[in-house]
Amino acid sequence: MRLLVLLTALLTAGPLAAEPVDFTLENLDGEAVSLSDFRGKWVIVNYWATWCPPCLEEIPDLVQLYEDNRDTLVVLGVDFEEVNTEYLREFVDSHFMTYPVVRSEPLPVTPLGPVLGLPTTYIISPEGERVARQEGPVTREAIETYLERKRGEAGDPAAKSADAASP
């Protein structure tokens, strides 16, 4: 039932922006990471925190989603709390978070829209447009179902390039 509610929320989310959005935050090595660095791929922007139980529950699904779809999408974790970098790096390593993680410090940065609770996830199209938003946990299955639907609607350039690269 929870999956059905989540899937419905993602599927019924209308376009959130008609033009590309961008932001730049620092990763755990202090390097700048911009949303526009990932143009041409779907981006799953996930606001989370180490103290948030629902955030921790969705990490394995997000890792698997990222690992299985690196050619067509990226998961970008945005840590939405004030903790020191070494603690955060150890946390990320201990939870096998292989996708990029950036910090929303020094101030909470929410350029995609409101973050009223954690986790909050935005889906960004390969063109850089916000196409969906979900408050609460997401699952790999719900995201994949949503992306399959969106790819079928619009002739997704990321899907086309992945198809061209396939044998």
Which residues does each PLM region occupy?
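Structural microenvironment flanking redox-active thiols in thiol-disulfide oxidoreductases
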Residues: 56-95, 106-110
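Bacterial N-terminal signal peptides
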Residues: 3-14
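Non-globular targeting/processing and membrane-anchoring segments
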Residues: 155-167
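Short active-site neighborhood of thiol/selenol oxidoreductases, capturing the structured segment around
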Residues: 36-53
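Thiol/disulfide oxidoreductase modules built on the thioredoxin-like
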Residues: 90-97, 103-148
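N-terminal "domain-start" segment that seeds a small globular fold
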Residues: 14-35
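Short loop/turn microsegments at loop-to-beta-strand junctions
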Residues: 20-21, 43, 118-119
